[in-house]
Amino acid sequence: MKLFFLKPLYFTLICLLFLSCNSEPSLQTYYVDHQEASGFIAMDFPVSFLDIDINDITESEQKAINSIQKFNMLGYSLKSGSDIVYKAELNFVKQLLKEVKYNELFRLGNSKDGRIKIYTVGEDHNMDEVVILLNSNQVGFAVIRVLGKDMNLSEIMQLGPLIEKLDLDYKNIDSFFNFMKPSTL
């Protein structure tokens, strides 16, 4: 008799579970769905992976680094994929970035050399995500996500020269960029 009353409870819990799942496409689900797909390369790493010596940086740089939690990088290479898939996937990512939460910060480039667009989630002094979309009709596209908590845009921008000085070759990040290099004919 007890079992009879438990069945509606289990059924209700299962229904609530399915209803609570967000079936809307998002940049996160796109990343997860494509990280092992043909033509794609993906890398995730925490900010500690950069191995920055805190004694060699300013207080502002330290605050910026502490606000970053991790990086996600996803790339589609034309040398490993096709032009048709490239265009379709790039358009899909662009549609995802039209979501209200993404604020386009700026864009650079042209259709010949390639384009860069930078998006943020949150206010300039209180961001949770920075998204960099790079695309080239000769190479492919890449989406780089910087995820964190209360990131400050001006402090994050100051990290550019610091990151350029890092020796990232030994950390296998070069495999991502080599994958994204154009093929030579």
What is each PLM-predicted segment?
Residues 153-185:
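C-terminal partner/receptor-binding element of secreted or periplasmic proteins
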Residues 28-95:
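Early exported N-terminus immediately downstream of N-terminal targeting peptides
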Residues 1-10:
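Bacterial N-terminal signal peptides that target proteins for export
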Residues 93-149:
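Surface-exposed, polar helix/loop patches in the mature regions of secreted/periplasmic/lumenal proteins
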Residues 17-20:
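C-terminal motif of bacterial Sec signal peptides marking the signal peptidase cleavage site
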Residues 75-83, 143-148, 162-164:
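Second-shell loop/turn segments in exported
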